[in-house]
Amino acid sequence: MAAPGSGAPCAELCRQLLLTLVVFSFACEACKKEIFNIPSKLEADKMIGRVNLKECLGSVDRIQSSDPDFRVLEDGSVYTAHAVVLSDEKRSFTIWLSDTEKRTQKEILVLLEYQKKVLKKRHTKETVLRRSKRRWAPIPCSMQENSLGPFPLFLQQVQSDAAQNYTIFYSISGRGVDKEPLNLFFIERDTGNLYCTQPVDREEYDVFDLIAYASTADGYSADFPLPLPIRVEDENDNHPIFTEAVYNFEVPESSRVGTTVGVVCATDRDEPDTMHTRLKYSILEQTPRSPGLFSVHPSTGVITTVSHYLDREVADKYSLIMKVQDMDGQFFGLMSTATCIITVKDSNDNLPTFRQNAYEASVEENTVNVEILRIPVEDKDLINTANWRANFTILKGNENGHFKITTDKATNEGVLSVVKPLDYEESHQVVLEIGVANEAPFTRDVALRMTTMNRAVVTVHVKDQDEGPECSPEVQYIRIKENSAVGSKISGYKAYDPETKSSSGLRYKILHDPKEWITVNEGSGSLETYKTLDREVITPKNDLYNITVLAIDQDGRSCTGTLAVSIEDVNDNPPEILQDYLVICKGNMDYVDISAIDHDSSINGAPFYFSLANTSPEINRLWTITRVNDTAARLAYQKNAQFQEYFIPVAVKDRAGLSATKTLRVNLCDCTNPVQCRAARRSADVILGKWAILAILLGIALLFSILLTLVCGIVSARNKKAFPDDLAQQNLIISNTEAPGDDKVCSANGFMTQTVNNANQGFCGTMGSGVKNGGQESIEMVKGGQQTLESCRGAGHHHTLDSCRGGTIEVENSRYTYSEWQNFTQPRLGEKLHLCNQDEEHMPSQDYVLTYNYEGRGSPAGSVGCCSEKQEEDGLDFLNNLEAKFAALAKTCTKR
């Protein structure tokens, strides 16, 4: 009985101890007290200040206010829940902070004060507390943005330790005092009380860095200047604003859930990283009002799809009214709206469909490039896009390629055409299966749940037509050997009537034969060689010689076919060495390569076999030839070969045994003077082409034409009068005499002529000269010799005929005979000689020296003789009776 009695008090004690521990664990620990200066009247949702919650309790999951007139946000901002009027100068409430995980609770006492302007008098020196260790230090200070006053609003008091010993006067400077904005702050000179004169906008000025000064009455600085920062506490006075009034986005229809449509963004001018700038996005309204298709992330503003039923054919555009609100979206936060236009882009989610499942068409046989049917389709996708345009395909029935189907871009219809003639005898009708799809591929979801191509059947009826002969196959092949004898028979081209399947009654003609080697039998179509076939003359395509044949029926209808003649090669062309002239520089080159070609086919061509085709022991001793490859050989010389030009015959043989020999001109040169080697090579390589030969012939023809012209001119000149009238014919006569003549007495003997046929002898003739006023005569008697006229004086005219040297003298044939010529000239010459002698006898002697100008060299001609003795006055009587127009000239020429 004792044990239970004693155990009961022990259990009670344990329960009391546990209860005490629980109470102590939840006991509230007080944090730093907060004091706010506020006006006596406050509006609802008005911020009065901010407390530092994290400084009091690191992790807070529950915040409560003891006064229902005030609420506290997560960042410590204290707001009025509704309008508040302070009846007393002071009012307080408690903020409880709880951390349920750590079972910790703390409280913050908030003291609200309403103070009128208090002008504190400066303490007297006796009443000032003396704290010798206190220093002049900055005092933390802040003020509420857009404060309601009363103004001037007391902020704090500034005091210096020097005030214990001196009378101190206070002053401030900085932005808000003597810098813009001016006169926003002032300090009482005696007390150090700092005041603000008007509300401040934090978005314009977030802090004021003032400097406080303490000085004595005589201006002595009692302490160092004190930095005095005044921070402006933010108030939620700015609405969040979207960056754009209207957003435009696009999204493909049938998009998957979660597809990003776009991003909206808003900004808030309030203090960053506070509840005033913590924004939340939401959708207020969607138009058209269909089930919700879009959502927006509350923090990032990303708009996404929440349904895959976006269908452009139902609605191609949606309008969303977007809302953004600060204070983390709480109902008392500030908000603004914007419009978001979302356009649904078309995707290929609708298949083109045929209006009916079966179609029929008809066409006559042998008709091509005709349209036989138009097939319409329907598609709900956006018109004139790749999602709407149809792409038709013939799936079955067009194995022979008779049909083609295209799309009419304007109507989106399928156009079925015949591109290859149909044959009624082969098939009376053709059944086609037509498929249709879009140009753009189908969306994945559509492709998974339905077929991607619709089908329809088209039956084409072929109409019979009376047709002409048919050349089938179009290309027929035959073989014939090269160099076949003229008149060799060849099986010809065969056409037939498709109705009777017979070739009777058809006529054949050759439309095109490149070399006119073949003739055709018009009735049977058999061929016959007209000329010898030479495979190497032409360059056959694919080793075929094509002949175009025309087959004609009795009604004049025709068809055209090709007869491909395969000409079998015959080894009728020996190999040909390409080189003619070769230069080998001895010492630098030990050999030279030569090559050959064969115009025959490969079976009669390479490999070639080269050898020396000379029985001369010297050539065989000095030169060797070896194989390089199938078409080339190497010609080498021995070391003891001399510098000279060698003529080396080389034989080359093809694989079939046909050979040819060519003599190569090889110049073994020391190349010390390469020009000589090259010159020899150039002379050896000169080959006249057809144009050069033509130019030579034209030159020869031109030369003959010039010679013919000269001959004609000479003949015409000989037909003229041999001895013209003794007049100058109003032309100047060149005497080629510039020096004085010899003094000679002209003989009056008769004229004497002599003809000498010997080419080695000369001819001498003497001619008398008479006087004829105003004229000069010259007689040319000799062709091919040289004539010299000696001078005779006679009335200022001189006529001389000297000897003729070296040449055959010929007397021109003319219409005058010799006797006529003598009768014509002898009296006149005798008269002239007589007058010349008389003038010489009556001429006074001139024994004085005559002056002649030096002209650089002596004249090869003789003296002008009696002509130089002519008096100046002779024959000048006409100058005495000059007309008036010559008076000035006469005056100029008269000696003075």
From Swiss-Prot:
MF (Gene Ontology): calcium ion binding
GO CC terms in record: desmosome; plasma membrane
InterPro entries in the record: Cadherin-domain_protein (IPR050971), Cadherin-like_dom (IPR002126), Cadherin-like_sf (IPR015919), Cadherin_CS (IPR020894), Cadherin_pro_dom (IPR014868), Cadherin_Y-type_LIR (IPR000233), Catenin-bd_sf (IPR027397), Desmosomal_cadherin (IPR009122)
Keywords recorded for this protein, A-Z: Calcium, Cell adhesion, Cell junction, Cell membrane, Cleavage on pair of basic residues, Cytoplasm, Glycoprotein, Membrane, Metal-binding, Repeat, Signal, Transmembrane, Transmembrane helix
Proregion span(s): 27-134
Stretches in topological domain Cytoplasmic: 712-896
Ranges of residues in domain Cadherin: 135-242, 243-354, 355-471, 472-579, 580-690
Tissue: Expressed in stratified epithelia only, such as the epidermis, tongue, esophagus and rumen (at protein level).
Topological domain ranges for the Extracellular compartment: 135-690
Localization, UniProt: Cell membrane; Cell junction, Desmosome; Cytoplasm
Residues passing through the membrane, by range: 691-711
Glycosylation site list: 165, 391, 546, 629
Membrane topology: Single-pass type I membrane protein
GO biological process, one term: cell-cell adhesion
CDD domains on file: Cadherin_repeat (cd11304)
Top-level lineage group: Eukaryota
Pfam families: CADH_Y-type_LIR, Cadherin, Cadherin_pro
Signal peptide feature range: 1-26
Domain notes for this protein: Calcium may be bound by the cadherin-like repeats. Three calcium ions are usually bound at the interface of each cadherin domain and rigidify the connections, imparting a strong curvature to the full-length ectodomain.
Assembly, per entry: May form homodimers. Interacts with DSG1; there is evidence to suggest that the interaction promotes cell-cell adhesion of keratinocytes.
Protein task: A component of desmosome cell-cell junctions which are required for positive regulation of cellular adhesion. Required for cell-cell adhesion in the epidermis, as a result required for the maintenance of the dermal cohesion and the dermal barrier function. Required for cell-cell adhesion of epithelial cell layers surrounding the telogen hair club, as a result plays an important role in telogen hair shaft anchorage. Essential for successful completion of embryo compaction and embryo development.
Protein name from the UniProt record: Desmocollin-3
Organism of provenance: Bos taurus (Bovine)
